[in-house]
Regions:
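Mobile active-site "lid"/loop adjacent to the S-adenosyl-L-methionine
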Residues: 125-128, 173-186
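Conserved proline-anchored active-site loop of SAM-dependent methyltransferases
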Residues: 28, 46-60, 69-73, 116-118, ...
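Long, positively charged, glycine-interspersed low-complexity recognition regions
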Residues: 183-245
Length: 245
């Protein structure tokens, strides 16, 4: 295990950005890497089209191949790029939070402000006063784990066209909470794209359920952190398209 991976094992990252993989990212990484090696994908580019706050990506810090991340949340991508430039964010006050909430301009600061939202759900209400500066300190610890990651300009994952990539997708769960102001995620279209990508790439998908032509290669029960379902068990499955397992 490399130095950066050991660094993260010592780091309990507790920010609850919805859909994050902080708690089980290491297990997912291990399954994907093992299967990639078995399939002859040694050091092939690794791509996450739904990278979020790098809950899974951080575990690839020691990976020798290219690492590429993308997300539809423009503010989060700008935030990650700023962290790569050694940005050290300060404590976020409620006044600053409300200013960014009402702003229509995308920025790293707006992405940072959104992480102070209740239960990590986008600008649902300020929840950063009880531990001032905690979110910023946590992000600073993330910085060395994403050095060298190429974050693509925010945009739709549908435009991706490449071959021989290792791809990990952590899409919004079907039927779960949508962020205010965002277009509802098209799950049916997503699975069609996964079938297409799987023809020329090694593709893994995190979901609780999937179409019948996808099969489970790993599974784990976890507790939901979103307030409306907090404490309820959810089965996290890792799927591949049948014939590629």
């Amino acid at each position: 295990m490399g130095t950066l991976s050991r660094l993260f094992i010592k780091f309990h990252y507790i920010m609850s950005y919805q859909g994050g993989k902080q708690r089980i990212g290491k297990e997912i990484h291990d399954v994907i890497l093992r299967r990639a090696l078995e399939a002859g994908y040694d050091n092939r580019p690794y791509f996450e089209p739904f990278v979020g706050l790098c809950g899974a990506m951080r575990w690839w810090a020691d990976y020798p191949g290219k690492r590429i991340g993308n997300d539809s949340n423009q503010d989060i991508i700008l935030l990650l790029k700023s962290l790569q430039k050694e940005w050290n964010p300060t404590a976020m006050t409620e006044e600053e939070y409300m200013t960014q909430k009402s702003s229509s301009q995308h920025s790293a600061l707006r992405g940072y402000a959104s992480l102070h939202s209740f239960r990590g759900m986008l600008f649902t209400g300020y929840d950063g006063g009880h531990r001032p500066g905690h979110v910023g300190r946590s992000l600073v610890k993330l910085t060395p784990l994403i050095k060298g990651v190429r974050f693509l300009p925010p945009g739709s994952y549908e435009r991706f066209r490449s071959k021989k990539f290792i791809i990990y997708c952590d899409p919004p769960y079907k039927g779960t909470t949508s962020y205010r102001g965002q277009v509802k995620f098209d799950s049916e279209k997503f699975w069609e794209i996964m079938r297409l990508w799987s023809k020329d790439n090694l593709v893994f998908i995190s979901e609780s359920i999937a179409p019948d032509d996808f099969e489970i290669v790993w599974s784990r029960v976890k507790r939901c952190q979103v307030s409306t379902n907090k404490g309820k068990a959810r089965t996290e499955n890792l799927y591949v398209y049948r014939g590629t397992a």
